[in-house]
Amino acid sequence: PGAQQLMGRMFDPKAEIEDMDARGIDISVVSSSTVLQGTSWADPNTDLELCRRCNDQAAEWVAKYPKRFAGSFVLPLQDPKRALQELERAAKTLGLKVANISSSYNGVYVGDPLYHPFWEAIQEFGVAVWIHPEGIRDPWFQRYALWNSAGQSIEEAKAMASLIYEGVMTKYPRLKIVMAHGGGYFPHYLGRLDRNTANRPDTVRNTGGNTPSTFLRSFYYDSCVYDPLVLKVLLERVGADRLVMGSDYPVGEKDPVGWLRGCGLAGEDLAKIAGGNAARLLGI
C-alpha cells in the first residue's frame, strides 16, 4: 500500500490491533513518530501543547484497550523545564510507561549537561526511555534518502556517545534506555572507540576512566536492524537479555516475530527478545 494508507493505520487503534493479531503481537507500545511529529522546530509553548496532545491520545488508547497497548510519551526537550513538568504528568497522572525522545534538540545532544536534571528525574521515576532520532536535516543526507538509511544510524551512534562521554551513564546507572535500530553504528566500532581512549585518556574524564565498550550493556537495543548478521553481533556483544523486538510499524517488518525466528532465535532467547525483556522494562 501507499505510504499515506500505511501511515493511516498507525493512527487507528482498531486497524493497529488487526495488524497485531495478524502478526501474533499481544501488546504494542503506542508511540508518536519522532520523524513525522518531531517538534523541536516549534516555539516552546507550541511544542509543549503538541506533546500534551500526543500524550493524551496515547493515554486514551491505553484506557480503551488496556490489554493491547502500553503507552509512551513525547516531551518538549528543547525546554528542559517544560519537559520535566510534562514528564511528571505523563508518568504519574497518565500512567505512560516509556519516554520517546530524539537524539538531539536544536543541535544539543541528549547527554549534554543541560539534560542531566532530566536524566536524574527519569531515573527517579523509573520509566524507560526509547531514543529514535527525528532525522538528519543536513542537505547532503537528503539525496538518495540517506537521511533515513544512513543518517538515522549515525544519529543513534552520536546519541550513545553523548550519553557515555558526557557522563550520563556513569552518574545515573539505573537508567533503562532502549536504542532504536540496534544502536546504529555505535556497537560495531568499539575497537576504534576504545583505542582512542587509550591514546587520549582525557576523553573519558566523565566516565571514571571506563572505556566506551564498558557501557555497551548499560543500554537496551531494539531488533529492527534488517540484517541477521547485525543482530548476531548484538547478541554476541550484549546478550539476549538486552534486546527487545522492534518492528518499525507500520512501514517495517510485516512479521517481526517471524523475522527473529528466521535469524535462528528460539527457546529462551526468542522469548526474551519477543516480549519478556520489554515486559520487564515496562513493569507489566
Which ranges hold each PLM region?
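Short glycine-enriched loops at secondary-structure junctions
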Residues: S33, L77, P133-R137, Y249-P250
